[in-house]
Amino acid sequence: MNYAIVFRLLGYVLMIEGALLLLPAAASLVYGEWMVLGVFLLTAAVSAGIGYALHTIKPRSKVFYMREGFAATSLCWVFISVMGAVPFVLTGCIPNPVDALFETVSGFTTTGASILPAVEGLPNGILFWRSFTHWIGGMGVLVFLLSLLPLTGGSHVNLMKAESPGPQVDKLVPKVQSTAKILYGIYFALTMLELVFLLIGRMPLFEAMLTAFGTCLLYTSPSP
């Protein structure tokens, strides 16, 4: 087992999640939710910091095989879910860590289940993050990350095989990373198209964004 490449990959993933956490932080800044803003900035810093520390691990080989793919997939799912649940807990929106983890995993897996009886009273930054997890998971979390991760050789294929439910991986183009980029490019375009239609229908911008995040391609959760 090439543990070094697994942890290095996990480091990349956590740094990416740290960057993604800045988006709900920006929403909190716009709406003047200073406590929520601080929580997102702290969570982003911790995620990026841990990720950078793991990223410094130098593997002997940058190519990994199926067993490394399964290990990396499992660890990535655990860590991104735990870090994604932190803002719910620290802001007090979902005080119970288990409930917060359930809400986060439900978002990343687009399950659509929720422990929240109503979402209208949540801070806008939390609403943004909750809906954004659905959008990230809409095409598969690791498919999204595959489009960003700097892997080599057959590493992308082995990682996607570990994430995919079927016995084989279908590709639009020879490179798996290019396939992931094409798929998320189409996904992003469809999201923007839905957003435009919602705005034409006179839905407020913020609510339109949350609705587009949660309903592009599939229905996952109610928007406020």
Model-derived regions, located:
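Membrane-water interface regions at transmembrane-helix termini and the short interhelical loops
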Residues: 28, 53-66, 121-131, 148, ...
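Alpha-helical membrane-spanning segments of integral membrane proteins, especially the hydrophobic core
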Residues: 119-139, 170, 174-182
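Transmembrane-helix bundle segments that line or gate the permeation/cavity pathway
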Residues: 81-117, 124, 134-159, 186-188, ...
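Juxtamembrane inter-helical linkers in multi-pass membrane proteins
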Residues: 154-175, 212-217
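Pore-domain transmembrane helices of cation channels
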Residues: 43, 47, 167-194
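Cytosolic juxtamembrane amphipathic/interface segments immediately preceding
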Residues: 1-4, 60-64, 164-178
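Conserved small/polar residues in nucleotide/adenosyl-binding loops
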Residues: 219-224
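N-terminal alpha-helical transmembrane segments of multi-pass membrane transport
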Residues: 1-99
